[in-house]
UniProtKB/Swiss-Prot annotation:
Higher taxonomy: Bacteria, Pseudomonadati, Thermodesulfobacteriota, Desulfobulbia, Desulfobulbales
Annotated residues for binding of ATP: G78, P79, S80, G81, C82, G83, K84, S85
Enzyme class: translocase
Family of the protein in this entry: Belongs to the ABC transporter superfamily. Phosphate importer (TC 3.A.1.7) family.
The EC number(s) this enzyme carries: 7.3.2.1
Recorded GO MF terms: ATP binding; ATP hydrolysis activity; ATPase-coupled phosphate ion transmembrane transporter activity
Originating species: Desulfotalea psychrophila (strain LSv54 / DSM 12343)
Quaternary structure and partners: The complex is composed of two ATP-binding proteins (PstB), two transmembrane proteins (PstC and PstA) and a solute-binding protein (PstS).
Keywords: ATP-binding, Cell inner membrane, Cell membrane, Membrane, Nucleotide-binding, Phosphate transport, Translocase, Transport
Protein name (database record): Phosphate import ATP-binding protein PstB
ABC transporter domain segment(s): 46-288
Top-rank lineage group of the source organism: Bacteria
Length: 293
C-alpha cells in the first residue's frame, strides 16, 4: 500500500467517525451524548443536573450535568456557538430576561434550587456574580462603581464601612495601588484592563460565592490578560470561578478542571492537564489538536 495512503487513512477514518456521530439535523447522536470524564465533585458549590435550554423551538443545550467545586476554577471550552456561554448564563439566571428562553433541569447553589419560585434573582446574582466579555463599568466614579452593590444590598452600615469594602475589593482585584488617589474619577477613564479588574472588584464587593467570567480577556492586550489571569488564581482561594474561554492556553493556565462543549452537549469534563494531554473522547482530541473548531 502506498505510504501516502497509509498516512491519509487515519484522517479519513476520523472524518467518517465524526460524520457517524452526527444525526441528520447536524446534532450529536444519542450514543455520543454521554459525558466522558468526571463531571461531579464532592461537596460541590453548585450542581447542575439534566439542564436543557430552549430558545423558542430551538434546543441550545441539552442534558448538561456537571458540578462546580468549592474554590476551583472550572474552564469551559468549545467552538463558537456550542452552548458554553448559554450554559454559563443559566448559573445565575441571566437568561430570565429573554422571553423565548426556557430552562429545565435542576441547578443548585449550596443545595438550594436557584430556579425555585421562591428564589429572588437579585440576591442570587450577588451570590453568583458575572464578569462579561467587554468591560462594562458604570458611568460613575471608581468608588461608586464598587460601592453600588453593597449599598443596594445593605451590606454596609455606614460610610466608613462602605469605604472599607471598596478598598478591600479593589485590593483583591489588584487595582487599589493604581487608583487609590483617583477614586473620584470615572470608571470609564481607566484602561481596558483596569476597567475589567474594576468590574471584578464590583462583583467581589457583594461577597459572592461564585464568579462567572464570559471571555473576560478577549478584549484585552497580553499584559492586561496576564494580570487578570494572576487575579483569577488569587481569587480562587476564596471563590469558585467558572470561566468561558476560546483561548485553550488560558484554560490550561488558570483552571483545575476543564469542560468541553460541542453542539449543545457536554462531551467531556476532567482535570485540565488530562483534558489537554490525554482526552478521553475523540471530539475533545480533535478540538484540542485543531482538527476542527
Amino acid at each position: 500500500m502506498p505510504a501516502g495512503l497509509i498516512t491519509a487513512l487515519p484522517n479519513q477514518l476520523r472524518a467518517i467517525t465524526m460524520q457517524l456521530r452526527l444525526d441528520t439535523n447536524g446534532e450529536l447522536s444519542e450514543t455520543s451524548q454521554q459525558t466522558v470524564g468526571v463531571p461531579f465533585v464532592e461537596n460541590a458549590r453548585m450542581t447542575c443536573r439534566k439542564v436543557d435550554v430552549h430558545y423558542g423551538e430551538k434546543c441550545a443545550i441539552k442534558n448538561i450535568s456537571i458540578d462546580v467545586g468549592r474554590n476551583e476554577v472550572l474552564a469551559m471550552i468549545g467552538p463558537s456557538g456550542c452552548g458554553k456561554s448559554t450554559f454559563l448564563r443559566c448559573l445565575n439566571r441571566m437568561n430570565d430576561s429573554l422571553a423565548s428562553c426556557r430552562v429545565s433541569g435542576d441547578i443548585t447553589l449550596d443545595g438550594v434550587n436557584i430556579y425555585a419560585p421562591t428564589v429572588d434573582v437579585v440576591p442570587l446574582r450577588a451570590q453568583v456574580g458575572m464578569v462579561f466579555q467587554k468591560p462594562n463599568p458604570f458611568p460613575k466614579s471608581i468608588f461608586d462603581n464598587v460601592s453600588y452593590g453593597p449599598r443596594i444590598h445593605g451590606l454596609a452600615t455606614g460610610k466608613a464601612d462602605l469605604s472599607e469594602i471598596v478598598e478591600s475589593s479593589l485590593i483583591k482585584a489588584g487595582l487599589w495601588d493604581e487608583v487609590k488617589d483617583r477614586l473620584h474619577e470615572s470608571g470609564t477613564s481607566l484602561s481596558g484592563g483596569q476597567q475589567q479588574r474594576l468590574c471584578i472588584a464590583r462583583a467581589i464587593a457583594v461577597s459572592p460565592e461564585v464568579i462567572l467570567m464570559d471571555e473576560p480577556c478577549s478584549a484585552l492586550d497580553p499584559i492586561a490578560t496576564a494580570k487578570v489571569e494572576e487575579l483569577i488564581a488569587e481569587l480562587s482561594t476564596q471563590y469558585s470561578i467558572v470561566i468561558v474561554t476560546h483561548a485553550m492556553q488560558q484554560a490550561s493556565r488558570v483552571s483545575q478542571r476543564t469542560a468541553y462543549f460541542h453542539m449543545g452537549s457536554l462531551v467531556e469534563v476532567g482535570a485540565t492537564e488530562k483534558i489537554f494531554t490525554n482526552p478521553g473522547h475523540q471530539l475533545t482530541e480533535d478540538y484540542i489538536t485543531g482538527r476542527f473548531g
